[in-house]
Amino acid sequence: MTADSPLPSVYSLFDLHSHSQASDGLLSPEALVLRAVEQRVTVLAITDHDSTDGVQPAREAIARHQLPLQLIAGVEISSLWENHEIHIVGLGVDIAHPALTAFLAEQAERRLARARLMAERLEKALIPGALEGALALAAGGAVGRGHFARFLIAQGKAANMQQVFKNYLARGKTGYAPPQWCTIKQAVDVIQQSGGRAVLAHPARYGLSAKWLKRLLAHFAEQGGEAMEVAQCQQAPNERSQLAQYARDYGLAASQGSDFHQPCPWIELGKKLWLPGGVEAVWQRFPDILQ
């Protein structure tokens, strides 16, 4: 957002979690911002997995098309806590900050090492060519399980993403390799060093019991985490209100985001994104993410 861009109004629609081809999204950064405007999103954060490569092309596309869209530079960092992969979104980061660029280069090496191990395990299961296939689908972006999933579907090994993860890529399955990510503290620190705000992504998606989710939230807050996602497109009944209560309990600001990866009927940019009463929105507590 430029210095003379207007601040969002009360009627703004924020989507603070989305992915482009810079990681495992299907749309280019240009197509992503165009779709966001079509869906009446007015403030969009591009938060690719361990990559900020989609941000500058998106900025250029917004300027070229003169889109009525404010872009927040973001990233979604993969971390490890108690043997669970936990994602930390950074909002309002300086994508050129040396600490962030060096950190993301390390994450890219970890990603590639994991991809090689996944491919080795799939090859032992008589599924050759997985690494080459996944890297081709990543097209220079951050390679991840989503690319392996698309490769396996194209090979006829599964009908859809849910099935391919269940049969091949979930923990304990043939193509799963344990991640060697950074700690939550390291993720929070580098986000803040680069001028951003640290947000716990999709807290209800980690398969944690209520007791363990509270432990995660307490740990995240203790490590300097500042906000948590409360609203998403797809949520179980009462999940949003429960997450809002957790945000209040742990002193965290509330964020919202679709976690959009590709066009599909149930997850769409800006869809069903609203915050319950009694929480403080991350853009209200930390207006610097809009600058």
Language-model segments: what does each one mean?
Residues M1-H84, Y168-A170, T183-D189, S194-P265, ...:
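An N-terminally biased module of ancient metal coordination in phosphate/nucleic-acid-related enzymes
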Residues S20, H97, G144, A236, ...:
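Alpha-helix initiation/capping motif
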